[in-house]
């Protein structure tokens, strides 16, 4: 098993307002985490950034699942109704696979994953490692200390407008 302590450090260095803002605006007119209780506000959200990690596809106990209501803000100033702990335990007992983890905050997942809060999580079994694949050996690299590691690849789709800015359409 692996235990991971997640830290929401999405704040300015002094931890005081104005808070670090999400890369993309959060639509407060939809049901979302809403740490400041501004239900339905049409203004830009300017409060602390809520976050919660979810290991997508993992077989984990519910307290370590990172459900959408388990979010918390920096310093635990606000916590979602599903918050239990910032430390998750992953049993890692399922078959070897590539999983991915991402922010799972209620109503904000689409924007936080789009902004890059996502990464790979590998489960391996040395007894089941393929020595070679049809195209050759596994794509491995070596660091400056001679340690071999695998290269993970997560592909995400991005759209850009004519000015080269990220485009996240609000309709369709």
Residues of each region from the PLM?
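Histidine-centered copper-binding motifs that mark active-site loops
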Residues: 1-172
């Amino acid at each position: 098993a692996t235990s991971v302590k997640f830290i929401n450090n999405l704040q300015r260095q002094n931890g005081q307002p104005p808070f670090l803002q999400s890369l993309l605006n959060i639509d407060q007119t939809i049901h979302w985490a809403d740490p400041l209780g501004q239900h339905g506000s049409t203004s830009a959200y300017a409060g602390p950034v809520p976050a919660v990690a979810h290991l997508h596809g993992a077989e984990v106990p519910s307290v370590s699942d990172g459900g959408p209501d388990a979010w918390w803000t920096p310093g635990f100033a606000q916590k979602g109704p599903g918050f239990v702990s910032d430390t998750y335990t992953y049993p890692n007992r399922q078959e070897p696979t590539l999983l991915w983890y991402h922010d799972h905050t209620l109503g904000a997942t689409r924007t936080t994953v789009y902004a890059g809060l996502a990464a790979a999580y590998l489960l391996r079994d040395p007894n089941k490692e393929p020595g070679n694949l049809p195209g050759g050996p596994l794509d491995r690299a070596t660091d400056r200390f001679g340690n071999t590691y695998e290269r993970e690849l997560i592909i995400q789709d991005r759209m850009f407008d004519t000015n080269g800015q990220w485009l996240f359409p609000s309709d369709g």
